[in-house]
Amino acid sequence: IQSTSMDQGILTEDSMNSFIRTLIQAGIWKNKLPKQTARTKDGMQTTVKRTEAEADAMASKGFQPIVSVDAELLRQQRRFSSPRVLLSENAPLEPPPLYLTEEPLVQNRTSRRKREGKRHRGEYSVCDSESRWVTDKSSAVDIRGHQVTVLGEIRMGPS
């Protein structure tokens, strides 16, 4: 499998879907050969595994599994995320962060922060907030409702 278009960052959702469809149709997901579809007398479809002779014939024609990905692994990791890959059952609502470089890079960081609003990167206040200076507060309630002790003094550096 060549990844030239993926390296260039121009992989579209349609091309990724067609690639996955091709892998599934080729039976590569579970490292199995494709199944034949046969019709029974009542018109119902049934799947039949290929025989060893058919498997040898396909191997001689150049069919070889390229990738072996267990479907159970994909079921467990439905939301695997990396800068280049997002496996999900749902179509993405917006483009990946790598391609959101429409703004010029020279803009002022402060104005960008004001325009985008406040970002929370997993950092939330542990204690209840006060709008005035508090000097004698020794305990507080954290966001889970537990009573916590407030440190009066924090020493940093070598002690």
Swiss-Prot record:
Gene3D superfamilies: Cystine-knot cytokines (2.10.90.10). Residues 4-115 form a propeptide. Keywords: Cleavage on pair of basic residues, Glycoprotein, Growth factor, Secreted, Signal. Pfam families: NGF, NTF3_N. Residues 110-121 have a biased composition (Basic residues). The keyword Glycoprotein applies. Residues 91-129 are annotated as: Disordered. SUPFAM superfamilies: Cystine-knot cytokines (SSF57501). GO terms for molecular function: growth factor activity; nerve growth factor receptor binding. It is found in: Secreted. InterPro entries: Cystine-knot_cytokine, Nerve_growth_factor-like, Nerve_growth_factor-rel, Neurotrophin-3, NTF3_N. GO terms for biological process: cell surface receptor protein tyrosine kinase signaling pathway; modulation of chemical synaptic transmission; negative regulation of neuron apoptotic process; nerve development; nerve growth factor signaling pathway; neuron projection morphogenesis. Residues 1-3 form the signal peptide. Glycans are attached at N108. One of its GO terms (cellular component) is extracellular space. The keyword Lipid metabolism does not apply. It comes from the Eukaryota. Belongs to the NGF-beta family. Seems to promote the survival of visceral and proprioceptive sensory neurons. This is Neurotrophin-3. It comes from Candoia carinata (Papuan tree boa). The lineage of its organism: Eukaryota, Metazoa, Chordata, Craniata, Vertebrata.
